Amino acid sequence: MRPYALIDLHCDTLTDCMYAGSNIIDTLDDPARTLSLTSIPKDIHWAQFFAVFVPDELRGEKAIRFFDDACANFDRQMRKFADRVSPCRNVADMERAWAAGKTAAFLSVENGSAFAGDLSRIGKTKRQGVCAVTLTWNGENELGSGNVTDRGLTDFGRAAVREMERCGILIDVSHLNDAGLADVFETAERPFLATHSNARAVCAHRRNLTDVQIKEMVRRGCLIGLNYYGPFLRDGGAVRSLDDIYRHVAHFFDLGARKNLALGSDFDGAVLPPCLDSPEKAADFYEYLLSRGVSQQDADGIFFENARTFLRKNLG
């Protein structure tokens, strides 16, 4: 049995091509990438969040220029491959793309340094088509600190959370440290998401979410995307099979996150285990979940329905 659809909350394909120096106009159909229009299964309605990853070392005007260049690249690719992919800003756009047999493409940002410490840039970012922003990467920026430090949100970071909610940009807390996430809990008034994070009780990495954090996100109606990266799935990183990601699924379910769990692959942002290293293996993953006793309703929830419901309610 194959899934009807799949919504993937995170990949780094856009930025990966910029670093590699390849022809950025052709990136979305570059077979050298983990994710390409060719590798996406034609019989699965696919929605992909394409993240503009802004490196931690870029701040201020340099971060703005990098972000603007990446957005221009995204727009070029949407035009070049308009027969196969469609840019989307909401669920209605996504469903129109699916009805036309196209991949639905959402634009996101990984690292709030793209705001360059200026609240007025948040509204502009929304107008550029960005649907979600990861507040930090691993290091520090104007909003706060990532998982390599213990500092929480700055005053600007708290103000940015409120302005993102006002503008209708989804807040992404993946990469944020525990103090920063606690500050988001105090500041945010709307549900938010962790686009690519797993359960720390299963794999003890700082990038993963604690049980207390997961339960609070469930209470708030948030969304959590399973990350396929080995060191976030299994202590030591040596993923042996799909059993390693299933342990996270089972743990999230035990914590009441059955309606809050989604997918956030991290394609082209990390070296992934062989069982999860291609969009073409999505059907194998889906069938595996069913073989482990996950109901079709819950498997559909993980693959697309939980994310679709969340986006319909929260993506302005």
Annotate each predicted stretch with a short phrase.
Residues D277-G316:
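Mid-to-C-terminal alpha-helical segments outside catalytic/metal-binding sites
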Residues L193, A262, D300-F304:
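Beta-strand segments within the central parallel beta-sheet cores of soluble alpha/beta enzyme folds
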Residues Y228, G256-P279:
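Short acidic/histidine-rich active-site segments
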Residues D16, A270-P274, L311:
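Short active-site-adjacent structural elements
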Residues R2-N227, P231-G236, Y246, A250-H251, ...:
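Extended, charged catalytic domains and RNA/DNA-binding interfaces, predominantly
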